[in-house]
Each structure stands twice: as C-alpha cells, then as structure tokens.
Amino acid sequence: MTDARPARRPFFTIGHAALGLPDFIAVLLGAGVQRLVDVRAFPRSRSNPQFNLDTLPAALATQGIDYEHMADLGGRRGRQPGVAPEVNGGWDNESFHHYADWALQPAFGAALAHLRATGQRQCCAVMCAESLWWRCHRRII
C-alpha cells in the first residue's frame, strides 16, 4: 500500500543574532534550505546590518537561496482587540500571550497557510533574530 499524501518537507528555524553572515549561510546550505522566510516584524538590525532587508536577499541569492519577508508572521504584537485575556492565558510571558492572540487573526492564518504551501515546494527556514527558538515567537509559528 502506498501513501497518497504528498511528501512533507521539514521546516527549519534559525536565529541570526549569534552568527556572522558566512556561518549563517553555511548553516542554511548545510540543511538544504532553498528559501529563507524572514518573520521579523522589522526586518533590520542595528547590530547586524548584514541581516537587513536591503542587503540579506542579495547575499542569499548569490548562494541560490530565495528570500521572503512575511510581515504577518512577525512578532512584537500588542493586545488583540476582541480576544479575551483568558483565551491564551496559559502563557506566563506577556509577549507570547499577545502573539498567541495574534495567531487567532485571519491575517496570521493566511500567512501561515502561505508558509505551509511554500514549504511544500521548497525547503524553508523561518528566521528571526533570537538564536533560541523557544525564546522567540517562532515557537508558536
């Protein structure tokens, strides 16, 4: 018996804060990443300008890696109107609580569906600045 479902590709997650650009790209290439999905609310960094929106896509392209910024998956969300505080009240961290509330919004759902569809076509890594995924909104994505 064969499985009729399409093959699933893994999604990778990466934070750029502890890596220089050459090491960052080497990690992506080593994992076979074809598309980097930037989920920073503000795709720039004062301390690491090589990861800014105006420079990173070109650097990745030289290595055959596509770049996409998905603002609707970006973090740093405030309280969401219409979502009762107890809905995601299990979060001790207010930032995660607010982001979990944001994840209930249609814009987030559409962006997540787009990410999943993209992940069926290309091996993707989801990127933010935070090196530790469990301290980043990527843990909810």
Where are these regions (language model features)?
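Residues lining hydrophobic/aromatic ligand-binding pockets adjacent to catalytic sites
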Residues: 2-141
